[in-house]
Amino acid sequence: MSAHANHPFHLVDYSPWPLTGAIGAMTTVSGLVQWFHQYTMTLFILGNIITILTMYQWWRDISREGTFQGLHTFPVTIGLRWGMILFIVSEIFFFISFFWAFFHSSLSPTIELGMTWPPVGIIAFNPFQIPLLNTAILLASGVTVTWAHHALMESNHSQATQGLFFTIVLGIYFSILQAYEYIEAPFTIADAVYGSTFYMATGFHGLHVLIGTTFLLICFLRHINFHFSKNHHFGFEAAAWYWHFVDVVWLFLYISIYWWGS
């Protein structure tokens, strides 16, 4: 398809960001493995810096193309919507694998675990302390992001700003409480299959909360610079979908791992 043809599709220009993003991801994971084996964190930090700089530059280009160059036409937006939907579906299956591992281990605990769940020697978290507070925080953030979305659709700039701001604050609050919970935890990822499944599932969810908070922060900065209108705000809509997904996953985590699993 010619770049100069009369069609509504966005044919992207050559970009270095996929390559630098791949280099950043590879460097980050390599550095993480080094860090896990008690080596220096230098490579991990370098990978994070490359990834963050790539994200900034890439998102800047996408914002420019969609907002100022008008390249995100209706057919392009439909494609972006389907892309986001399929991405969230892939993430759902990603978390299903963690739940599968958890229930496989907990419903028929082996002799090595003492044939009980949680395994002998594991002191599980009280589900009615920090985990319950985190549940309330995420549910409240789901309400505030919906408030922001409806305000945006009604062209109410100030209320959309407030809703986004409170959602970001609640996301940061959740991450701080989860970090505190990890620091105070009476077991580690090395403590049998309970520790492995617990930290894998809740840790990856925590990572998704950080990603979602960053996504919403970008939307907040774009919103206060008037990049969104009531008819053209897919970037925000994608962030809201992602946040609701994170919210629902946490409910399943809380009910199965924290409450039932304790």
From Swiss-Prot:
Query: What is this protein identified as?
Result: Cytochrome c oxidase subunit 3
What are the TM regions of this chain, as residue ranges?
Answer: 39-59, 83-103, 120-140, 163-183, 201-221, 240-260
Q: Read off the InterPro entries from this record.
A: Cyt_c/ubiquinol_Oxase_su3, Cyt_c_oxase_su3_dom, Cyt_c_oxidase-like_su3, Cyt_c_oxidase_su3-like_sf, Cyt_c_oxidase_su3_a-hlx
Q: Which family does it belong to?
A: Belongs to the cytochrome c oxidase subunit 3 family.
Instruction: Give GO cellular component annotations, separated by semicolons.
Output: mitochondrial inner membrane
- Gene name in the database record: COIII
Which is an annotated GO molecular function term of this record? cytochrome-c oxidase activity
Q: Name one GO biological process term.
A: mitochondrial electron transport, cytochrome c to oxygen
Show the Pfam families listed in the entry.
Answer: COX3
Reaction(s) catalysed by this chain, per the record, are: 4 Fe(II)-[cytochrome c] + O2 + 8 H(+)(in) = 4 Fe(III)-[cytochrome c] + 2 H2O + 4 H(+)(out)
SUPFAM superfamilies recorded: Cytochrome c oxidase subunit III-like
Q: Does the keyword Isomerase apply?
A: no
- Briefly state the protein's biological role: Component of the cytochrome c oxidase, the last enzyme in the mitochondrial electron transport chain which drives oxidative phosphorylation. The respiratory chain contains 3 multisubunit complexes succinate dehydrogenase (complex II, CII), ubiquinol-cytochrome c oxidoreductase (cytochrome b-c1 complex, complex III, CIII) and cytochrome c oxidase (complex IV, CIV), that cooperate to transfer electrons derived from NADH and succinate to molecular oxygen, creating an electrochemical gradient over the inner membrane that drives transmembrane transport and the ATP synthase.
Q: Which organism is it from?
A: Anopheles quadrimaculatus (Common malaria mosquito)
> Quaternary arrangement and interactors, per the entry?
Component of the cytochrome c oxidase (complex IV, CIV), a multisubunit enzyme composed of a catalytic core of 3 subunits and several supernumerary subunits. The complex exists as a monomer or a dimer and forms supercomplexes (SCs) in the inner mitochondrial membrane with ubiquinol-cytochrome c oxidoreductase (cytochrome b-c1 complex, complex III, CIII).
